[in-house]
């Protein structure tokens, strides 16, 4: 997949840019204007170091130690020691795409020119991204204020030639990884250490990728529901645009319209005799999926602001030579948003699992064989995939409990309220994985039901779905290892190109 380079300006980054850099290796460039702003703000910091003017994190200690004066000669040690002491994350390492997203967002903050870092700091971030030096970053340890200190410190370690990093697929010492890539460690001064580790790029980087996945899962959920409509010969009156215009939530209107497009041309819909309405899991898809769609759209708006925001502290304003301490590092906007996203995405799986149950249950599936298998008894068919889906949605109910309602004091009670935003973001990555599996099971189950129903002519979109599914997964005629089928279905819906192809077919 060929992707365009991403030019970092400090204010124009998109969610799509983050995905391109994090997952597709897009080249990163720093704009000329950004380079100038970085130099201008660094001069202000240099003046403070020389003068000894009391300024947080430059001529003072950190947190509760902010009353301790730091001399000019101690400044370099202050910045280096900050990194060494704060690199205490634990747990499994973040995957490569998340680390790359984090690095890009930290670079974008520096590009704004309000961080006061040495130009070599953003330069090495650019080089590490482009040459594939990926720091080993433990996933746990952030309180979400003052930002993501512990996690970001592990990235900073590699930048100064410490810590560990991956290079060409191998984990090695950070200094060795830099050397193999032809890079040299940076020497920190001024406000560099604080400028690297203070802020919200970890929770925002995770969130940006999770948002992209959520948007694709929403499409996959609508597609899965459309195929279930085919299997149940669903009644499309509930999708009538007049109903949805009378309750004009955008997500609801868009969902109903999309499913109608998916089903256009189908010969199976609206063919049940003596029945005028479907159960809620079909009839209310626009209302349920639509509510998730609106929540996801809100999350995009928040993240588009945050990934272009300056979440460092203190901030340097070169125009009037001011350096001001504030609280932009506090992750509450992202914490609440990630919790919201988790709830919205979880609900897509909740209703999907109920459709799966309705498909396999002989008392509910409208005359299809029990568990969608002929010669049941000796064959169990799709009995246990529904168990798996039920297990995953139940796990998500635990994961969807909000992290942002929690707080705990730290740093001698100086930092007496925190966001837990990175915990919220980490949870959504697990929720997304679980939802993707549930939707894969729904696609697989719905395709089996359609074959057993004997659908003669599919809709524009559902027909494309069936062709894609059956290209990789044959109809189940006797028991086999369904794990393999689920993994194939998972691969199908995880591929953005497949989702886009079906979406285009339904237009």
UniProtKB/Swiss-Prot annotation:
Keywords: Cytoplasm, Histidine metabolism, Lyase. Its main location: cytoplasm. GO terms for cellular component: cytoplasm. Its EC number is 4.3.1.3. Pathway: Amino-acid degradation; L-histidine degradation into L-glutamate; N-formimidoyl-L-glutamate from L-histidine: step 1/3. Contains an active site 4-methylidene-imidazol-5-one (MIO), which is formed autocatalytically by cyclization and dehydration of residues Ala-Ser-Gly. It comes from the Bacteria. The modification 2,3-didehydroalanine (Ser) is found at residue 146. The keyword Cytoplasm applies. There is a cross-link at residues 145-147 (5-imidazolinone (Ala-Gly)). GO terms for molecular function: histidine ammonia-lyase activity. PANTHER family: HISTIDINE AMMONIA-LYASE (PTHR10362). Belongs to the PAL/histidase family. HAMAP family: His_ammonia_lyase (MF_00229). This is Histidine ammonia-lyase. It comes from Treponema denticola (strain ATCC 35405 / DSM 14222 / CIP 103919 / JCM 8153 / KCTC 15104).
């Amino acid at each position: 997949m060929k992707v365009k380079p991403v030019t970092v300006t400090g204010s124009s980054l998109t969610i799509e840019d983050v995905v391109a850099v994090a997952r597709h290796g897009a080249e990163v460039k720093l704009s000329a204007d950004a380079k100038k702003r970085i130099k201008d703000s660094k001069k202000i910091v240099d003046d403070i170091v020389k003068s000894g003017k009391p300024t947080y994190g430059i001529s003072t200690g950190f947190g509760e130690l902010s009353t301790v004066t730091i001399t000019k000669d101690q400044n370099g040690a202050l910045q280096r020691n900050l990194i060494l002491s704060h690199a205490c994350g634990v747990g499994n390492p973040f995957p490569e795409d998340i680390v790359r997203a984090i690095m890009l967002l930290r670079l974008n903050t520096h590009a704004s020119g309000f961080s006061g870092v040495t130009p070599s700091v953003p330069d090495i971030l650019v080089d590490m991204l482009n040459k594939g030096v990926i720091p080993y970053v433990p996933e746990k340890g952030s309180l979400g204020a003052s930002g993501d200190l512990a996690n970001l410190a592990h990235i900073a370690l590699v930048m100064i030639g410490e810590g560990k990093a991956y290079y060409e697929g191998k984990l090695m010492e950070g200094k060795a990884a830099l050397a193999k890539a032809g890079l040299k460690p940076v020497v920190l001064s001024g406000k560099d250490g604080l400028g690297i580790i203070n802020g919200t790029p970890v929770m925002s980087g995770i969130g940006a990728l999770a948002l992209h996945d959520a948007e694709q899962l929403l499409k996959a959920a609508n597609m899965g529901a459309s195929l279930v409509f085919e299997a149940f010969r669903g009644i499309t009156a509930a999708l009538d645009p007049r109903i949805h215009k009378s309750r004009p939530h955008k997500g609801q209107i868009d969902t109903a319209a999309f499913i109608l497009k998916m089903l256009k041309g189908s010969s199976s819909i609206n063919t049940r005799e003596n029945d005028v309405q479907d159960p809620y899991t079909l009839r209310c898809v626009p209302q349920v999926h639509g509510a998730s769609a609106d929540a996801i759209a809100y999350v995009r708006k928040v993240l588009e602001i945050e990934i272009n925001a300056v979440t460092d502290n203190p901030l340097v304003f070169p125009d009037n030579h001011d350096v001001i301490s504030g609280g932009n590092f506090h992750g509450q906007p992202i914490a609440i948003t990630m919790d919201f996203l988790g709830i919205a995405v979880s609900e897509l799986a909740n209703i999907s699992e109920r459709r799966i149950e309705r498909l396999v249950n002989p008392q509910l599936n409208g005359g299809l064989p029990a568990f969608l298998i002929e010669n049941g008894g000796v064959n169990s068919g799709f009995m246990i995939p529904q168990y798996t889906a039920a297990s995953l949605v139940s796990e998500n109910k635990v994961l969807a409990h909000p992290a942002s309602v929690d707080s705990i004091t730290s740093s001698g009670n100086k930092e007496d309220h925190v966001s837990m935003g990175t915990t919220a973001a980490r949870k959504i990555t697990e929720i997304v994985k679980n939802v993707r599996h549930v939707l894969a099971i729904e696609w697989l189950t719905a395709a089996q039901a359609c074959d057993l129903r004997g659908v003669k002519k599919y809709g524009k979109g559902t027909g494309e779905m069936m062709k894609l599914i059956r290209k990789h997964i044959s109809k189940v005629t006797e028991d086999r290892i369904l794990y393999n089928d689920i993994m194939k279905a998972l691969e199908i819906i995880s591929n953005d190109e497949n989702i886009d192809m079906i979406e285009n077919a339904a237009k």
